[in-house]
């Protein structure tokens, strides 16, 4: 198989949820779409600049102690519950469901992520390689107002309602009820990735590309100008997904 982060990657790269790497501790369940920590597979080192997608569930009262990052754009999308963040730059606060946090590690930053609540929390942590290394660390957190059946910008360097990272990529979040459908957003880059947070969808393609359905935890990388997916429809009562336009 051609590694998905190779410039000559195939038309479609399908990552079924059950084939992801799984880490399990007494306080953490983590599903890794790409190689991470002790899980290393040269065929799954990332997809273009998209280096990490981890689906983490953290038990109440537990979390990650202080640890360091460098030269990586780190995005945390809270799906359920809340998480307390603190870092070496003096930033601290609680990230709640619906919030998105952006942390540019740059020349180096240390941070902790602790679930101080009485309920488990679930989040998606995303790592994106920056276009330039050695930038100063930066931090931002926003509440993303979600409207069903609408692509909501999360990352977009040209949209003041969204955040931006040190790479010209776009990221949208979409929620659909059962039977609702929507056209894909305009994808201007040669690579795109869909990640299902919850629910099930069908995807229409002018080229009859497969798979035609995605389910919770599935990921799909594709070339927009060749796969030519046109429309997404929800097959479940509550569908929640992310769409990346990767440069």
Name what the model sees in each region.
Residues 1-247:
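Jelly-roll (double-stranded beta-helix
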């Amino acid at each position: 198989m051609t590694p998905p982060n190779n410039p000559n990657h195939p038309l479609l790269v399908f990552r079924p949820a059950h084939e992801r790497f799984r880490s399990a501790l007494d306080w953490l369940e983590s599903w890794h779409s790409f190689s991470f920590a002790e899980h290393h597979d040269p065929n799954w080192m990332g997809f273009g600049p998209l280096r990490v997608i981890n689906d983490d569930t953290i038990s109440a009262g537990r979390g990650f102690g202080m640890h360091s990052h460098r030269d990586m754009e780190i995005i945390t999308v809270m799906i359920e519950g809340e998480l307390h963040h603190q870092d070496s730059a003096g930033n601290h606060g609680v990230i709640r469901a619906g919030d998105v946090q952006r942390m540019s590690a740059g020349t180096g930053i240390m941070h902790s992520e602790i679930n101080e609540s009485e309920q488990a929390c679930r989040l998606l942590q995303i790592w994106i390689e920056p276009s330039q290394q050695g930038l100063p660390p930066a931090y931002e957190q926003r509440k993303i107002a979600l409207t069903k059946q609408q692509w909501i910008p999360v990352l977009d360097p040209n949209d003041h309602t969204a955040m931006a990272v040190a790479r010209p990529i776009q990221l949208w979040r979409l929620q659909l009820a059962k039977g609702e459908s929507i056209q894909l957003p305009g994808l201007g880059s040669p690579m795109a990735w869909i990640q299902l947070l919850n629910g099930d969808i069908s995807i229409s393609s002018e080229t009859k590309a497969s798979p035609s359905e995605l389910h919770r935890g599935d990921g799909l990388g594709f070339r927009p100008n060749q796969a030519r997916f046109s429309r997404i429809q929800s097959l479940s009562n509550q569908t929640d997904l992310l769409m990346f336009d990767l440069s």
